[in-house]
Amino acid sequence: MREFDPRGVEQRKHGHLHRRMYVSPGANLCWLINGCDKLKPFGFSIHGCVNGLSQRIIWLEVQHSNKNPRLIARYFLRSVKGAHGCPVRLYTERGTENGILAVMQCYLRTEGLDEYAASKAHKYVKSTRNQQIESYWSHFRRQRSSWWIDFFNDFLESDILDLTDEIHTKTLWFCFADLLQDDLDKVKDYWNSHRIRKSKYATVSGAPDMMYFLPEEFG
């Protein structure tokens, strides 16, 4: 990393790395999609979508894999149906898991009359440019996934769990997948209803649900 980005390494080392201000002119202008692999060693992969302006969580799901394009497409279609429309633009990282998603988004925006219609309705970005969802994963790691990691590690240290044993991993999924999804649902509800404070990195502040459903109240 030092060879490819020496300036960035030095900035991180001294705490001088500056985040960009995020600006979005409308509630459904963009959705940002990505996965979280912190619990993947235990067989639980998390996938999420965040609304650009409000930082509202659109979905937060646990599955065996967050690389299955059909599953991700299903999350997307379900959310589009619930929102009665698709975002103007969709941002994802480049990967085979996002291929179906990209095609669907561009198809849904085929008849759009704005600059992001059709093939421009989806854009592949690096994780460093997908800052809203990456920012949320950072919060999620601190607030929730670290608890689950410690919880499962206690099983390992007590020799209760052997991750090389298929019976153990399947039993772990059977016992905890629904509990973890229930926890994610609660995390989603809390996040969407809590107030985001003013920040020099954001143009608006307030509860994500309020900013999403009543964007006109936030300028």
Q: Language-model segments: which ranges?
A:
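RNase H-like DDE/DDD metal-dependent nuclease/strand-transfer catalytic core used by mobile genetic elements
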Residues: 2-13, 18-192, 196-201
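Long, compositionally biased intrinsically disordered regions
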Residues: 189-219
